[in-house]
From Swiss-Prot:
Record-linked NCBIfam families: PRK00596.1 (NF001861), rpsJ_bact (TIGR01049)
GO-annotated molecular function: structural constituent of ribosome; tRNA binding
Biological role: Involved in the binding of tRNA to the ribosomes.
Pfam families listed in its UniProt record: Ribosomal_S10
Xref: Gene3D superfamilies: Ribosomal protein S10 domain
GO cellular component, one term: ribosome
UniProt source species: Parabacteroides distasonis (strain ATCC 8503 / DSM 20701 / CIP 104284 / JCM 5825 / NCTC 11152)
Similarity section: Belongs to the universal ribosomal protein uS10 family.
Protein name (Swiss-Prot/TrEMBL): Small ribosomal subunit protein uS10
Superkingdom of origin organism: Bacteria
Subunit field text: Part of the 30S ribosomal subunit.
InterPro entries recorded: Ribosomal_uS10, Ribosomal_uS10_CS, Ribosomal_uS10_dom, Ribosomal_uS10_dom_sf
Length: 101
């Protein structure tokens, strides 16, 4: 095969992303491929501001924050064994995985 595989991990919980990235790197290194990463990408924060009351008190507001964490892993000189190991790998729910070949 010998092609570059790029894996992007995304989640709202940073510990899930880090554990998943560590699991992928350990699995790929066991098959003999070269791994670059996990590279942390910028954290995307969305802030929502809402009124505490439904009708009056405009000055009384509450803010909520939703952060998404991302990691990037590049795999070089992959073999069929590497791809099989990645297909069989079980990652926790709550982690979005995007793979580009």
């Amino acid at each position: 095969m010998s092609q570059k595989i790029r894996i992007k991990l995304k989640s709202y919980d940073y510990s899930l992303v880090d554990k998943s990235a560590e699991k992928i790197v350990k699995t790929v290194k066991a098959t003999g491929a070269i791994v670059s990463g996990p590279i942390p990408l910028p954290t995307h924060k969305r802030i929502f501001t809402v009124n505490r009351s439904t009708f009056v008190n405009k000055k009384s507001r509450e803010q909520f924050e939703l952060s998404s964490y991302k990691r990037l892993i590049d795999i070089y000189s992959s073999t069929a064994k590497t791809v099989d190991a990645l297909m069989k790998l079980e990652l926790p729910s709550g982690v979005e995985v995007e793979i580009k070949v």
